């Protein structure tokens, strides 16, 4: 039996598209997700001078949510991180 590949997907409501990164284990995918969330949180705090809230959507999906003025528009931004197992 082959081992699955774990895919970490990051998508943001204020950006087009998404990024996907493969990992050999579930643990490594979630560790990368934590680092990515820390990096995004630091960028949000530096850029917008506010702290995003974290929302656990499901066991495999987490969101950072913050309200900001982007291009002169008030908007709620959601950055979603998801980990999926893909069987080969």
Segments the model singles out, each with a brief description of its role:
Residues 17, 26-29, 65, 82:
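Short, intrinsically disordered, low-complexity terminal segments
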Residues 8, 32-35, 71-74:
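Compositionally biased non-globular segments, especially hydrophobic aliphatic-rich helices
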Residues 38-88:
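Short, mixed-charge low-complexity intrinsically disordered segments
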Residues 11-13, 24-52:
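A short, charged, amphipathic alpha-helix used as a generic interaction element across diverse proteins
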Residues 1-19:
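Short aromatic-glycine-(Arg/Gly/Cys) micro-motifs in beta-strand/loop hairpins
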Residues 22-24, 85:
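Generic structural detector for well-ordered beta-strands
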